[in-house]
Amino acid sequence: MSLLFLTICLITMNTLVIFDFTKEADLKNWDVINDTVMGGVSAGKMGKDAAGNGLFEGHVSLDNNGGFTSVRYDAGKIKLQGYSKFIVVLKGDGKAYQFRVKTNKSESYSYVYSFETTGNWQTIEIPFSSIVPSFRGRSLNMANFPGDYMEELGFLIGNKKEEHFKMAIDNITVQ
């Protein structure tokens, strides 16, 4: 066997797919949460583009003290032992977003990692050790994401300005 083949096998064996967007992928466990829960008027939606990629898009408004929209995926309990980072393949719009993950979906806080998009397809690598606990934009005095398991993940845009946004997502894995 060639060294290249063995390397590919080893890399693939240590990758767990959390969600792979395809034309057939069901979005029933993806929910949009807008700032309307707090009186705002921002509007985001989750769908698919023509290629089958996940498409999180909409408009963030600052009216009525709003300013964010988010999408969450209820993944069920997934063990993450043996992995050290999330990998997200996406195409953004040049804006800043947050990747958010919860160990227990009923917890009020999330673990958050902020990233910038380029407007091109890119691979975002998110080390578990860099995902920080946060509640409503405030850092918490707790350890960073432990990486034992997760139940929910998602994305949030809230850059303290009114803006349209659009982010396509190909897949989310852990390695």
Predicted regions and their residues:
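Beta-rich carbohydrate-recognition modules and glycan-binding surfaces
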Residues: 12-175
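Bacterial Sec-dependent N-terminal signal peptides
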Residues: 1-17
